[in-house]
Amino acid sequence: MLVRKLISSGLRIPARQRNKSLKMPLQLRWDAIMPGHDALFLDLLDRWSEPHRRYHGCTHLLSVLESLDLLTDPADPPRTVLLAAWFHDAVYRGIAGEDEEESARLAEDRLRAAGLPDAEVAEVARLVRLTSDHRPGAGDGDGALLCDADLSVLGGEPDDYARYVAAVRQDFAHIGDADFAAGRAAVVRHLLELDPLFHTERAQELWLAAAHRNLKGELT
């Protein structure tokens, strides 16, 4: 019931209008890692503000960046991880695997043009591709950070989680209810089967118990 109410209420506000209030905090974060690259910031902001996005918009981007802060506090997250967060859903059409690959290629193109070293560009693209399955290898600390931050929404409070599910449903508004329900159930089961779901000790402390509660609740 709550999910349906959310779908029919504030989530129908156009994405660009919802995201206007996030421009300043996002720009401050961007300027901290890529000063002088305003054109690239505006390009990414436009992409994250596309009207077909509900969950995969600027709110999600800011949430991932804030989650990275939590995971690395008191240190700052590595710049490559932060840039990967900025690019990880820069291309979003709702096609799993293809979106991440196109986002990684976009990162390679834009960051190379911005003058970043080839090794840094390659690392950002590698991290973006990891978000297609959230399975970083053993010892991949930066990959673990990004994957955990991307999935941090799973460990939210029940009302926040309901808003997340409602927003995801709107991202797939072109799919019928039965097909979406089947696809979503498969995603939830996949997430529950991930061992570990979160890879960093800090993320496990912050979100694991709530994430399992929320995911299991979707299947009941």
Question: Where in the sequence are the language-model features?
Answer:
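Extreme N-terminal basic, low-complexity initiation segments
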Residues: 1-11
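Divalent metal-dependent phosphate-bond-processing catalytic cores, especially two-metal-ion Mg2+/Mn2+ enzymes
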Residues: 19-32, 49-56, 67-75, 87, ...
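An amphipathic alpha-helix signature
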Residues: 27, 31, 41-42, 65, ...
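Short, well-structured alpha-helical segments
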Residues: 38-45, 58, 62, 78, ...
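Histidine- and acidic-residue-rich, metal-dependent catalytic cores
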Residues: 47, 103-137, 189-191
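Active-site metal-coordination segments of metallo-dependent hydrolases
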Residues: 50-60, 92-104
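His-Asp-centered metal-binding catalytic motifs of divalent-metal-dependent phosphohydrolases/nucleases
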Residues: 64, 79-94, 103, 125-132
